[in-house]
Amino acid sequence: MSTFTYDHIHIRSRDPENTAAYYERMFGAQVIRSMQDGKPRIDMKIGGQDVFIAPVPEKSNVNPPPVTPYQGLDHFGLRVTNIDKVVADLKAKGAEFTMELNEPRPGIKICFVRGPEGVSIEVLERAPK
């Protein structure tokens, strides 16, 4: 069988600069600006992983974000330590929480925030094994 490895997340945005600034402010993303095919491109690194931001032109046939919940890709998760402090920091920065911090089962604490373009982001802490 072939070997598969994780490569990236791809986000479409009407305002890539604002989207990148949000992830940088909220999650400490490293914003990487470059040129591709003569056009500006914005990518990010979050937790060592690649996140690409594709611009959505004003006049395009790209649909708006769906109403949640919906089928298909639901969210991506960012693991942290000291989640109580992280949640307090995110609230101080104005993050919009769609699910407050809770413990769905022993050893895991989670919450969800809504990012630009309606992207759902889980922030979680797993107890050491």
Name every feature range the model reports, one short phrase each.
Residues 19-24, 90, 118:
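Conserved active-site tyrosine of GNAT-family acetyltransferases
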